[in-house]
């Protein structure tokens, strides 16, 4: 396997698949925080200990195939260019913290990019499993099986009373973070999102932007995750989040239908104006691109736009990020240069998709 595929392919294999409710839920993620006995936490350990942790996982797992995921590749942060690290963040394969603040960090990646094991982030390892659509239970099962497999080769820091020990007290217990990425344009347009977010927070869940803590909800994409890890089982945490997500899906669908009834041609006009901008613009920044892509995605889901597939929108949401634009350019770009390249890339990708659809219809 070539490292290049991780940096040059925008859409991971799992992202190109349709999952349950994938018109609204882009992805489901389970993340497990674990630490190894006899080593200090990453917040306290020495550079030598950090290197020992990486070496431990390299020896134990790099050449050991794991089921359908196959072999893992080890990517060391110290050996990657800043642009390459940014690409991995944009694909949700590593966290911004690992990319920016972990000089001795690393990541084990499966070939299909469904599994990512971050090493020396806030904890010794963070196991991540990503699934398309609303598949929290399936992602939990996959993460738990992987967790058991890893535990067969290393000894976890575990307390009979507290559970899994972690650097941050908010992760102690199960060490589990379950999250879903949701596209909620109708709840934003109707401003219902302003009352929904505080209500979700009161239920012990947290709402963040596209790239987690501190990030903006670009393109009306929100990340919903659990906050409590202690005193509940993994299954209960996931079930509670699943229930809330199903309610959000129902509210978003109802809001979409209400917009169709109340706005009618104005909503259709908004969608096609955004499509027109994407198909013809010469300069576009990431924020405007994300908003237009959101409008077009809504138009596809409502049946207004028929010559573009939802998968192309998923691809463009990542391709148009600063890291990917610079990776394709082969070097650092100034913001204004990125805006020109972003516009050209979107125009060309939409042209290719329209041509492909037309050729398919003629057959």
Curated annotation (Swiss-Prot):
Pfam families: ATP-gua_Ptrans
Reaction catalyzed: L-arginyl-[protein] + ATP = N(omega)-phospho-L-arginyl-[protein] + ADP + H(+)
Gene Ontology CC: one annotated term: extracellular space
GO MF annotation, one: creatine kinase activity
Residue ranges of every copy of the Phosphagen kinase C-terminal domain listed in the record: 24-255
Sequence motif RDXXRA motif of the pArg binding pocket involved in allosteric regulation, location on chain: 338-343
Keywords: Allosteric enzyme, ATP-binding, Kinase, Nucleotide-binding, Transferase
Positions bound to ATP: 27-31, 92, 126, 177-181, 208-213
Alphabetical GO biological process terms: phosphocreatine biosynthetic process
Activity regulation, short description: Appears to be allosterically activated by the binding of pArg-containing polypeptides to the pArg-binding pocket localized in the C-terminal domain of McsB.
Cysteine-cysteine disulfides: none
Mutation effect (residue 122 to A): Loss of protein kinase activity
Record comment regarding domains: In the 3D-structure the McsB dimer adopts a flat 'domino tile' shape, with the two active sites opening on the same side. Individual subunits are composed of the N-terminal catalytic, ATP:guanido phosphotransferase domain (PD, residues 1-263) and the C-terminal dimerization domain (DD, residues 264-355), which are linearly organized in a PD-DD-DD*-PD* manner (asterisk denotes the partner protomer). The PhK-like catalytic phosphotransferase domain is structurally adapted to target protein substrates.
Record's subunit section: Homodimer. Dimerization is important for full catalytic activity.
Biological function: Catalyzes the specific phosphorylation of arginine residues in a large number of proteins. Is part of the bacterial stress response system, where it is involved in regulating the global heat shock repressor CtsR; phosphorylates arginine residues in the winged helix-turn-helix domain of CtsR, thereby preventing its binding to DNA and consequently inducing the expression of repressed genes.
Family listed: Belongs to the ATP:guanido phosphotransferase family.
Name recorded for this polypeptide: Protein-arginine kinase
